[in-house]
A protein has these predicted regions:
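A glycine/proline-hinged amphipathic helix-loop "lid/cap" segment
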Residues: 2-110
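Short, low-complexity Ser/Thr-rich regulatory SLiMs
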Residues: 109-114, 159
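Short beta-strand element of the alpha/beta-hydrolase
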Residues: 118-128
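Catalytic nucleophile-loop/oxyanion-hole region of alpha/beta-hydrolase
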Residues: 133-134, 140, 153-194
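Primarily recognizes the serine-hydrolase "nucleophile elbow" in alpha/beta-hydrolase
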Residues: 174-220
């Protein structure tokens, strides 16, 4: 058997065992919602409010896209980022915002009045990996702090195309490790009583990727 044929056979064997290994890992299927169950408002009034809000956001985003569609792509990205950050700029929130350096990642603590800061939630915003920030999601993170009775750490992870997607995951890891040792009140030598990771859209994708990283590296 020639050296080239042996190399091909060896490569196929490696791929075969790699596939078997990946298929044998925990799929996290036990965390899925029951078939047919949707995460969202259930009553008619809330569904209508949600529908109108989404329509208003889409209209504003499309208007911005049309207005700047002739710009070079890099300039258009900057405009879309500014537009997204300004979506809820006039909205009132009840939470306190505290800017921090979370292990080298710019972030902000979002803490609703009276929440238990030993309960911490890492929030990873959406925005197609190239837009969004803690500022664009403050209405959401403030409400999350309220309903989960926890301090929310919203991170400003590095975005594409200036950075690679793996940089996004690295920022999630660094800020998560920092969050385990810090609270809105400063360095915390006590382990948090509860830890959550959540995100929307691209942030939801990063959440799943990061949770698998935690699982494979035996992190909390």
């Amino acid at each position: 058997m020639s050296l080239a044929v042996s190399a091909v056979c060896f490569f196929i064997l490696i791929v075969f065992w790699a596939v078997l290994y990946l298929l044998s890992r925990d799929t996290l299927a036990h965390l899925d919602l029951p078939a047919g169950q949707l995460f969202g408002p259930q009553d008619a009034e809330s569904k209508e409010i949600s529908k109108l809000a989404v329509a208003a956001l889409n209209k504003r985003l499309r208007a911005s896209a049309v207005k700047h569609e002739k710009l070079p792509w890099k300039e258009r990205v900057l405009v879309l980022r500014e537009t997204m950050d300004s979506f809820f700029s006039g909205a009132e929130i009840v939470s306190t915002l505290t800017a921090v350096d979370a292990g080298g990642v710019l972030a902000e603590w979002v803490t609703a009045p009276g929440v238990d800061v030993s309960r911490r939630l890492l929030y990873i915003h959406g925005g197609a990996f190239f837009a969004g920030s803690p500022k664009s999601h403050r209405v959401l993170t403030s409400k999350l702090s309220e309903i989960t009775n926890s301090a929310v750490l919203a991170i400003d992870y590095r975005l594409t195309p200036e950075h690679s997607r793996i940089a996004c995951v690295d920022d999630c890891r660094a800020s998560y490790d920092w969050m385990l040792k810090n609270s809105p009140e400063g360095v915390d030598n006590l382990a948090p009583t509860a830890v959550f990771v959540a995100g929307d859209s691209a942030g939801g994708n990063l959440t799943l990727s990061f949770l698998n990283l935690i699982r494979d590296n035996t992190r909390r």
